[in-house]
């Protein structure tokens, strides 16, 4: 099963990790505007979302989705 990440989860995780859009873009190997577009809810390629998700997972983020709710946890 593939777990996807919503734009809201991306921004929640990025902010909780104290990362800028530049930080996430660099760690994911994508452009800063790509991060901004995704977090705004604009369409980006599935491969790009996966790069963003993996960068956040590598930093310890955990994404949850249950009963119509999404969430994120990060290490303290």
Language model region names:
Residues 9-23:
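Short basic helix-loop element that most often maps to the first helix and adjoining turn
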Residues 19, 30, 61:
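Short glycine/serine/threonine/alanine-rich loop segments
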Residues 46-64:
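DNA major-groove recognition helix of helix-turn-helix/homeodomain DNA-binding modules
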């Amino acid at each position: 099963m593939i777990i996807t990440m919503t734009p809201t989860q991306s921004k929640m995780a990025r902010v909780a990790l104290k990362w800028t859009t530049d930080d996430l873009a660099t760690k994911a190997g994508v452009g800063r505007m790509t991060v901004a577009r995704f977090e705004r809810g604009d369409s980006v390629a599935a491969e790009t979302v996966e790069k963003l998700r993996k960068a956040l997972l590598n930093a310890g983020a955990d994404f949850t989705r249950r009963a119509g709710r999404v969430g994120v946890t990060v290490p303290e």
